[in-house]
Amino acid sequence: MKEDRIVFIFGPTAVGKSNILFHFPKNKAEIINVDSIQVYKEFNIASSKPSKNLMKHIKHHLVDFLDPEKEYTLGIFYEQALRIVKEIRQKKKIPIFVGGTAFYFKHLKDGFPSTPLVTSEIRIYVNNLLYLKGKSYLLKELKNVDPIRFNMLNKNDIYRIKRSLEVYYQTGIPISQFEKKQNSEFKNILIIGLKRSFEDLKTRISIRINEMLNSGLLSEIKGLFSKGYNENTPAFKGIGYNEFLLWKSRPCYSLNDIISLINKNSFLYAKRQMTFFAKISNVLWFHPEDDLVSILNLIFNVDKEI
């Protein structure tokens, strides 16, 4: 392993990313979390944060540190990631990025897009448009001013919809024209993708959701609501949390309805993740269990019996 190399390990939700980390040698690497919800404090169960045992086995960064009311952006993540990589390298360890937020991995590999800042007045204006005219109006407006960005975005990703319009209203230039590839800070990247069949993923997602419920997800959700967290809380955008906003605001939704919706949304998200990851070049794809020895050898150059 060259000293300047970093490692990416990514894959869809429930593929088994955390499980392979228990097999990593102690004190040879540190993990940089690549998950936009696990960064938040208090939002623990549905975000599938690494267990205490796993974090004791191998050090994790960017987990459970951010106030749920704070927005976490690509720019913040990118800046923190650069700093942490330097710190890990100073310890003569391997920086390993692990997670499922494909958008973050893309820009770690390709470089950070140089989009402009926008004023608070523009942000307020776009928020007012959302409040007065609704998401459908924002989508229609985005399609008119930036069809490239419109076709790229998840139509439920209200944060990036707003951000795209903010940049356009601020500059008169579509955000898609700003987001050209920059030079990445990282030149020597080992990219490992984890995959399973969709049938296997669907089963594992269902099992995981049942485990979350048995671990106290409902109590966690009620506790979050009691603290005043709501639909305006950035952490509530995560799957497994966002669906409970319906449960709170619309009594016609039963708990079983919400669980079914979480299952559905989780599987659709896993499919979107795989579609996005498939567009990233130079990925070495492995099954997280069948190919575990190969993964360990590739990263650490060690043989291990499983």
UniProtKB/Swiss-Prot annotation:
One of its GO terms (molecular function) is tRNA dimethylallyltransferase activity. The record marks T101, R123 as: Interaction with substrate tRNA. It catalyses: adenosine(37) in tRNA + dimethylallyl diphosphate = N(6)-dimethylallyladenosine(37) in tRNA + diphosphate. Its cofactor is Mg(2+). Keywords: ATP-binding, Magnesium, Nucleotide-binding, Transferase, tRNA processing. Its EC number is 2.5.1.75. Residues 35-38 are annotated as: Interaction with substrate tRNA. One of its GO terms (biological process) is tRNA modification. Substrate binds at T13, A14, V15, G16, K17, S18. Catalyzes the transfer of a dimethylallyl group onto the adenine at position 37 in tRNAs that read codons beginning with uridine, leading to the formation of N6-(dimethylallyl)adenosine (i(6)A). Monomer. This is tRNA dimethylallyltransferase.
